[in-house]
Amino acid sequence: WCEQEGLFWYVEHTADKHCIVFTDTVDTLPALAPQSIRFHTQNVTEKQDGITQWSSGSQLLSGKLHWRSVDYLAHGQPRETVMPSLQAASAPQALERYEYQGQYGWQKQDRGQWLSRVQIEQHESQARRIQGQSGVRQMQAGRWFELTQHPLYERKAAEERQFLLIEVEIFAESNLPLAKERREVPGSLAALFRSVRPEPSGLGVVNKVADTLGVGSHGFFLNRFEGQLHSVPFRSPAEHFKPNNPGPQTAVVVTPSGHEVFTDTLNRICVRFHWDRLSQEGELGSCWLRMMQPSSGPDWGSVHVPRAGEEVVITFLDNDIDRPLVMGQVYGGHKP
């Protein structure tokens, strides 16, 4: 739900507690302290923490996102939204992304505009990412910083050198003495640490002697991070979806106590699925469901309404479990 609505979260760590903060804009995110972080290569000895590796990439995006949905209450009047790319300079308008959103995807136009805006911001957030490696100890996801002394960004405006940290992976090893003969236990992180542990220049022999004597390790700290421009809206990628359509199911028609037939003004009915163990007898525990009829049209057609306790077959439009449709009735042991 958060991904669909454009919400994301970060964690604030303090000495006595950890707090999860939800937000929908990068403007509320705090900066690192200090805010400016220098870039320098690994072969340079520095007294201050800095970023040692940096890479960036981008993808070609569509120039606009076009959505369409239909609602049977407004027959013949499809609902549409057209959302232009926020990064219009690098997204040709001719490259349109068209998506059909199924039955009654939104009720009001501003709701459809917001949902489509969130999706196009998801694409743009993922399209331009930076990756790096550093020894900066205060690196933390949900914070932003300003890059300095990088040759590709030195002449750019301040906002083009400000980056939001999306993910930070930290590796740290102490310099405590280790046993000469040690065995890796199941689930050990030793293999992962070997893949990232730096080899200090000129100290290879010293480290080998230290390992042999068991007097200690040189220890290290580094992190890998992913980020984006702070000026670009961040949206979590769509990675969590509704459960898949389970296929056609049967259910029992339910009505309030004392009613053999019960519908709304559109002749829709309520049902109780066989797996529903919470709904009570006589309770309308489902939404109103439309039912397929032998014929239907303006001023002609026929309608048959199932009675309480009768069994019906239900399918789901566009594989959406929130869009059930009654296909017809079936006989069972209680109704020969």
Question: Language-model segments: what does each one mean?
Answer:
Residues C2-P336:
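Amphipathic alpha-helical and helix-coil boundary elements used as assembly
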